[in-house]
Amino acid sequence: MRLEGKTAFITGAGSGLGRAASERFAEEGATIVAADVDTDGLEATADRVADLGGEVTTHELDVRDGDAFRAAVDAAAEEFGLDVLLNNAGVSHDRMDFEAIDDDVRDRVLDVNVKGVWNGCQAVLPHFKEQGSGAIVNTASLAGVIGAPQLTGYSLSKGAVVNFTRALAAEVGPDGVRVNAVCPGVTDTPMPRKGQSDEEWAQRKEELARHYPLKRLGEPEDVANAMLFLASDEADWITGQALVIDGGFSCA
């Protein structure tokens, strides 16, 4: 199995991509340290990992809190060792014109999406450097590569994650640490369907899929498989990359 004997710390694990990654990593042998502010979602993820036969522990964690992030990582490293960090927790904002985005909305998006990634990397790097190995996978977005009109705050945050990933990869590569990012297009997770009924979302998915050469939106498993690859030893000579997973949208 591709992550046999490894431990992965996964933020935003209570739903969506984080839950899919927790399940996929567990299927490949990883011990899962699942973190999220959503304790109900965490419990559901833990149950699903356990049903797969995986070992899992949970931490209620707001990634904006650097001290809490370090404490959770230190505890995981002491109990299990630590090999992979998946910085996946993230938020967006409603589509609106740039001038309508107020400071509170902007700050929340930047604090979770940028400071959260920063805090996670600062928490794990002492452990990774000491052992001379480790893989960090940051969840960015296609919006961080090509930009998304009326999602300028979100685009700003994810663009920062992409360039931060490249800079940090160059810095810590000599320490044996790899840092990569995934940049998904629209994926069927709670974030893009927020505020929509099942019927409304089904119609919206059909409309959006027309713009993708592969004629469908992404599923969480599509992104989780890419995360798994970048976290595994199969990607041992890959670092500083922002892997676009978008069904061909950006080339159409």
What spans do the regions from the language model cover?
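Conserved glycine-rich cofactor-binding loop
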Residues: 7, 14-15
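Alpha-helical segment proximal to the catalytic Tyr-Lys
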Residues: 126, 170-174, 236
